[in-house]
Amino acid sequence: RICPRILMECSSDSDCLAECICLEQGFCG
């Protein structure tokens, strides 16, 4: 999957860019 390496806080996958998913730590990855 394509995920820009930008540190973004999230509460769900929809908060993240491209194909990033929301990881357990509360950040996109």
From Swiss-Prot:
SMART domains for the chain: PTI
UniProt cross-references to Pfam families, sorted A to Z: Squash
Family the UniProt entry places it in: Belongs to the protease inhibitor I7 (squash-type serine protease inhibitor) family.
GO molecular function: serine-type endopeptidase inhibitor activity
Predominant place of localization: secreted
Alphabetic keyword roster: Disulfide bond, Knottin, Protease inhibitor, Secreted, Serine protease inhibitor
GO cellular component, one term: extracellular region
Function of the molecule: Inhibits trypsin.
Domain notes: The presence of a 'disulfide through disulfide knot' structurally defines this protein as a knottin.
Organism: Luffa aegyptiaca (Sponge gourd)
Keyword Kinase included in the entry's annotation: no
Protein known as: Trypsin inhibitor 1
Disulfide bonds: C3-C20, C10-C22, C16-C28
SUPFAM superfamilies: Plant inhibitors of proteinases and amylases (SSF57027)
InterPro entries found in the cross-reference section: Prot_inh_squash, Proteinase_amylase_inhib_sf
This protein's record includes keyword Hydrolase: no
Site (Reactive bond): R5, I6
Signal sequence residues: none
Subcellular location(s) per record: Secreted
Transmembrane segments: none
Superkingdom of this protein's organism: Eukaryota
